[in-house]
Amino acid sequence: MNSIVVHYKELALKGRNRPWFIQMLVRNLKAALAGLHMQAFRSVMGRIEIEMGPETEWEEVRTRIARVFGIANFSPANRGPHDFDALAAAILKDLGDREAASFRVSATRADKRLPFTSPVVEREVGGRIKEVTGWRVDLSRPALTIHLEMLPDGAFYFFGKDQGAGGLPTGTSGRVACLLSGGIDSPVAAYRMMRRGCTVLFIHFHSYPILSRAS
């Protein structure tokens, strides 16, 4: 896979200031992935595409993106054409020797003006894959889900989703101070505020030896 498709949920509810929130999320992603040979970051119709370099290690990328607030889910992905034959061929090539007892194709259209519906894409691409692999179609509990996202200039396809941290991008809701005590409540409160977009400044009073180590 050459790209990463990053989806956000809460940001999509924003109004005219939505581009600023997306810009902050892209900034945070760039900071989190610094040094991993990423080649490009693009906002593409309700999602963010990150282009990976040839030296990029996916497992390290996965670990870092999972910690970035503002993301609903993300996936390693490739681009394909609108043509159903060529798209199915590209998917089959990337599937390689993978085996699955059952599968389904789940398609969405980023642009509703495209001259085909999502069910048509699922039926046409899924039929071609079934013809080659012989896999059983299961729309309820498939062993493998092939996700398609149809864009005006092509399509993304990917085979799974990693859960993101959710919330809002860090830096979109101002700064707060958090007094760290010896309990679990203060770090939990800090995490919840970070998830709402706050930049947290941590404060701790080291009072030993005036007070005992227990206090």
Language-model segment annotations:
Residues 183:
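Conserved G/P- and acidic residue-centered "switch" motifs that form tight phosphate/ATP-binding loops
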